């Protein structure tokens, strides 16, 4: 009898202890909320808007050269997918699936599928190392994850060059992306930390949120290369330093002080306010005034 009790107690202890090593199930269909940086993510950032970005001078110079016609003229840009760091902020649903170890039934990999550009990424949880620096770089990079309690921390390297914003702000192949995934009920929050020594002077921290939507379907994204604007072969629309006439529009539309619009690490901290004592906001909003969620951001003047 004592032996039976001991065995039963042992089994019960194992069941009670199991949740301590349990893994959070992130699988499902997740719909984006667009509650963070709505204008930047839905209609897209204005030209010259580098607010909130700890850019260095080289990145700012590169961004100033941007001409939106580049996408229409250079066909290779038209179907270029979002990279792993930007896919999280794009206009598309997210589907997460998992692979399980046959012996332990523990999750050994997550797979993400984002509708925009049909981006697919694998996040390995089996402890494998990242490849050497000279290994191939891709738009989704190489991702591994580790558990910290109920939080999954993901590290992604080997990213092809991409962009931080869709207004020409670049992101280099030296970038390293760290993500922290957490679930609260039916809400998924991902806090991302991007380090890029070629572009940023400090890490760039952003967050994105989704809600569980079982009825959602992340569909296909057919994309066709089409010459939209006539141009001579080999033309790449751009602006030389100091010649971009469109950078002033953002300052005028929103009455944003030029010192803040240019970005830089110092603009992220409260002490920077002391440099803006003469700043006076506009008396009333004139552009994207109702930009809350998706529908209210489709037009500068509202729905």
What spans do the regions from the language model cover?
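Repetitive helical segments and hydrophobic/amphipathic motifs
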Residues: 11-13
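N-terminal signal peptide c-region/cleavage motif recognized by signal peptidases
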Residues: 17-19
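Bacterial N-terminal signal peptides that target proteins for export
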Residues: 1-9
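PEST-like low-complexity, intrinsically disordered acidic/proline/serine-rich tracts
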Residues: 22-303
